Amino acid sequence: MELGKTQRVHIVGIGGAGMSAIAELLLKSGFSVSGSDLSTGDVTDRLTAHGAVIYKGHQEGQVADSDVVVYSSAIRSEENVELRAALKAGIPVIKRDEMLGELMRYKSGICISGTHGKTTTTAMIATMLLEAGESPTVMIGGISDYLKGSTVVGEGKYMVIEADEYDRAFLKLTPTIAILNSLESEHMDTYGTLEELKQAFITFANKVPFYGRVICCVDWAEIRKIIPSLNRRYITFGIEEPADVMATDIVLLEGSTTFTIRAFGIEYPNVRIHVPGKHNVLNALAAFSTGLELGISPERLIAGLGCYSGMRRRFQVKYSGNNGLMVVDDYAHHPSEVKATVKAAKDGWQHSKVVAVFQPHLFSRTRDFADEYGWALSRADEVYIADIYPAREKAADHPGVTGELVANAVRKAGGKQVHFVNGMEELYTALQTHVAPQTLLLCMGAGDITHLATKVAVFCKEHNADH
């Protein structure tokens, strides 16, 4: 891929999931990449190993030799010293999605959208196409075990991209195939209303060329509602609703799921994916539908799905003892994601006590969805709620909004053993009392709770009597 081997790209906020993925893609494509972030860690260390120059913190001089500066939607351009310095120096400043849209010009784009399931579905499609010998270029907002990273630079004609709806970023992309994986209220700080969000998905889907295809999950009511507004060809998939591609005979096992795919009247039995939960069956149906549209044989698609080995922070098992003690780390941060993850744990590990540990993400999301979180978490046997991870928001702008709102909502929804613990060290101490046989410690959230999951896993390894 000849993308101009000498340009230097500087990325502000390079440690974020989406930004680190595009940094990795640029590095593998031959660009010189530098970047800055307020904190460093495993993600930035991996980029350094690939050749990136990483700065901790933001300073004017760090953009001096750049040909272009890229920033994420989470960065406020008027407040960031590097972006101001770049604009003053006449260096082009663009958002991440604009850069991604430019890179997509070289390939046929397969873009996976949806309020949930984007990362897993993107990784499933990538694995499937790689196993089929298609050599795709891939960019995922997470770390794939199979890919050993978040990107692949391939020689084939397809580019598989996770399409993020936040800040309307996905409207800058140019999909040949657009997947609508799920749709419900999310990112209201961007859209204001669900109707505006639905209109954005319609606009995204209708960017597909006349020879392309839109692939829609009809199990989501809001997707069913927007289908009449699509003016491109589409196919449907689902479990609960009649669709072109469906799954039946679903068997939920510990760590894997088996099912039959019925596609356009033809049945394909004994499909196995090595991840738990019905929500992952839907993700697999999206991938299978995409492969059919590309003309790949069903047998090769099923074999490819069987090679999918999961994502970091997507029901990632951090510790598993012989006595049934487990620690799981998951990125779930929307009520529907939390509900699906808790359900996967309860359905797949029916003889285990499921202890859900949840860190709310964003004050606004916690305020808007506290009751929904309550219902989502109430099925767990015991629940711990951490305080809110603020991300781009400030506590002062949201008085009275704390993790206690979620804890109270869980109690209201019927949760019997519910604890609000303010402080990660205090939470770590509390979880140590649950190091016992047949216990699944399920840590969920998009913030730094992942570090707690790792710490608890280390404690289990050192103190569990049977590992």
Curated annotation (Swiss-Prot):
Belongs to the MurCDEF family. Keywords: ATP-binding, Cell cycle, Cell division, Cell shape, Cell wall biogenesis/degradation, Cytoplasm, Ligase, Nucleotide-binding, Peptidoglycan synthesis. It comes from the Bacteria. Its EC number is 6.3.2.8. GO terms for biological process: cell division; cell wall organization; peptidoglycan biosynthetic process; regulation of cell shape. Cell wall formation. It is found in: Cytoplasm. Disulfide bonds: none annotated. It is an enzyme of class 6 (ligase). Its main location: cytoplasm. It catalyses: UDP-N-acetyl-alpha-D-muramate + L-alanine + ATP = UDP-N-acetyl-alpha-D-muramoyl-L-alanine + ADP + phosphate + H(+). Pathway: Cell wall biogenesis; peptidoglycan biosynthesis. This is UDP-N-acetylmuramate--L-alanine ligase. The gene is murC. GO terms for molecular function: ATP binding; UDP-N-acetylmuramate-L-alanine ligase activity. One of its GO terms (cellular component) is cytoplasm. ATP binds at G114, T115, H116, G117, K118, T119, T120.
